[in-house]
């Protein structure tokens, strides 16, 4: 009788433990992140991706030319200066972009806080090696003095023979201010992160190549790279 009682007790205990485990599994919340696999990780947006090496290869046999670069978010991660400008001159709004005092600061020293992008180092080095003439065309407002040209030349080790002073195209409503400069300087290739950079290039028949804007840039919203069928450089967000 005692053996039967012990067997029944063991069975009841086992049943209770099993029920507890089942209930625990049933009540557990589904994982927040379902995980991924190699196929998903390898997915890329169906746009015209290119590497710096592929761009270089496409230029083999071509003589030296004039090439242009936008500055902010293309060759420099300059959000620190713009962030400080907003906090200083117009907290919570973009009014600081119309304030000449901000541009005097930004164009005369605040780029010391800007981070040169690695993709820009690779691109500029490649074009310098080819003997190309380097232009920087920015939408920043022009100021009486500027140190941006020297900062860029120092950051990217551009020889004097290849370097041209920064062109401050400014920003005018309803007008793409970079177009005239691309035409005037006979630019053959233009790199930029914004839609205006790509459309300016296309408007004058120039090869426009998209550089990805970093996701933590203060310049929002992020543009849709590849939307105009342009080439987009891989891993160019930094």
Swiss-Prot record:
Function of the protein: Dephosphorylates several organic phosphate monoesters. Also has a phosphotransferase activity catalyzing the transfer of low-energy phosphate groups from organic phosphate monoesters to free hydroxyl groups of various organic compounds.
Signal peptide span: 1-26
Name the record gives this protein: Class B acid phosphatase
EC number in record: 3.1.3.2
Residues annotated as the enzyme's active site: 70 (nucleophile), 72 (proton donor)
NCBIfam families recorded: AphA (TIGR01672)
Pfam families the record matches: Acid_phosphat_B
Record-linked InterPro entries: Acid_phosphat_B-like, HAD-like_sf, HAD-SF_ppase_IIIB_AphA, HAD_sf
Key words, A-Z: Hydrolase, Magnesium, Metal-binding, Periplasm, Signal
Binding site for Mg(2+): 70, 72, 193
Gene Ontology cellular-component terms listed: outer membrane-bounded periplasmic space
Record-listed substrate binding positions: 138-139, 178
Gene transcribed to yield this protein: aphA
Enzyme class: hydrolase
Cofactor note as given: Binds 1 Mg(2+) ion per subunit.
Catalytic activity: a phosphate monoester + H2O = an alcohol + phosphate
């Amino acid at each position: 009788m005692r053996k039967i009682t012990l067997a029944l007790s063991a069975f009841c205990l086992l049943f209770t433990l099993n029920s507890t485990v089942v209930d625990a599994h049933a009540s557990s919340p589904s994982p927040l992140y379902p995980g991924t696999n190699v196929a998903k990780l390898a997915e890329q947006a169906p746009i015209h991706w290119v590497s710096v090496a592929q761009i270089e290869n496409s230029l083999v046999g071509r003589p030296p030319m004039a090439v242009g670069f936008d500055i902010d978010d293309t060759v420099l991660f300059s959000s620190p200066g713009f962030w400080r400008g907003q906090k200083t001159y117009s907290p919570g709004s973009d009014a600081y972009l119309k304030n000449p005092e901000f541009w005097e600061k930004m164009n005369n020293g605040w780029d010391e806080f800007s981070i040169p992008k690695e993709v820009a180092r690779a691109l500029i080095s490649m074009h310098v090696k080819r003997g190309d003439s380097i232009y920087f065309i920015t939408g920043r407002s022009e100021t009486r003095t500027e140190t941006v040209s020297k900062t860029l030349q120092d950051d990217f080790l551009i020889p004097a023979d290849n370097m041209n002073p920064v062109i401050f195209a400014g920003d005018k409503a309803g007008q793409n201010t970079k177009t005239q400069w691309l035409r005037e300087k006979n630019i053959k290739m233009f790199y930029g992160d914004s839609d205006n950079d790509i459309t300016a290039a296309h408007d004058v028949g120039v090869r426009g190549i998209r550089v990805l804007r970093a996701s933590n840039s203060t310049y929002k919203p992020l543009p849709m790279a590849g939307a105009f069928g342009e080439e987009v450089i891989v891993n160019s967000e930094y």
